[in-house]
């Protein structure tokens, strides 16, 4: 890599290398407790997923292509005011700071000798302190409801809202992954057939959201990240 060669070798694993593969390991633990028939409490923790490096992109992501998955904390409650209705509320914490390739700010690159002769190679692309997406830790709040209208129909709806993980000072690198969504709305149903088979439908809509900020290498230009999402899933399950 550029860093491993002490800057004498041009970066060869930066872009245009097609697909790459990574594998990793992690763990999860959780508990669920129902003090009575109407209330269920739950909590879960998922460790950071330690992933193998993307060798074909070791000059792009920090730590020679390392791209770990962040740890998460989740707590939730489900309340059943009747036999037909269940209301659920979750709070989830995503620790993007666990993963340097995700959390490192793009300003780290300014300490690379290419930009700062007195700097260190570890701040260059692919270095141990190389630039990343600059994503911040975030909290996600989720509210959902499930209504069993009959023995054959169950309806569901949900809403989630979160902090914006991308600061307007981190625009250029995030062109690769413009994850600017803050809200998601979901709707769906399950229809149980006479033979016990089921038809499931779910619809997710994320309203358009925009983040705007200066281009990190030319502040006279603005970068606009905009995204809107729609997802439809239909499935059919049967019992033998």
Language-model segments: residues:
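Outer-membrane beta-barrel porins/channels
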Residues: 1-240
